[in-house]
Design a protein with these regions (language model features):
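Non-catalytic alpha-helical scaffolds and adjoining flexible linkers that form interface surfaces
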Residues: 1-131
Length: 131
């Protein structure tokens, strides 16, 4: 049964001209891997960037290492982080660190909510090296 899942982008690997494997930190399941079929007409590849929170539909099966997903949407826009090169650098660094830190598929909703708050705060505040 398909359900809506929220996730924070960690890493992506393009496998075909229209498919991409994405590692996400999800609110419901912890770190998970999904395959998305992306449409070049809709420019969906833009959604898979550091600090992007996305929401999508998937029939999640814990036994599978990779699940298929579709109907991807950005949860909230991240504009200032992408337009400020200093913030973009921090986003790339922190996304890489998060990718290395989260190995297990354990659900940790508190951590997900705190990361979400931190990223929203980073988006809306002026750049400060010690945010």
């Amino acid at each position: 049964m398909s359900q809506r899942i929220e996730g924070l982008f960690l890493r992506a690997t393009k496998i075909k001209h229209n498919s991409i494997i994405v590692d996400l930190l999800t609110r419901q399941y912890g770190r998970s891997t999904f395959v998305f079929t992306i449409s070049t007409k809709k420019n969906q590849a833009f959604l898979f960037q550091p600090f992007h929170f996305i929401e999508f539909s998937a029939a999640y099966t814990p036994e599978k290492k990779v699940n298929r997903a579709n109907n991807v949407e950005m949860k909230f826009p991240i504009i200032d982080i992408l337009s400020d090169i200093r913030k973009t650098g921090y986003a790339l660094l922190l996304t890489e660190i998060l990718n290395k830190v989260f190995h297990t598929e354990e659900k940790n909703e508190k951590l997900f909510v705190e990361l979400e708050k931190m990223i929203i705060s980073f988006e809306h505040r002026p750049f400060n090296a010690v945010f």
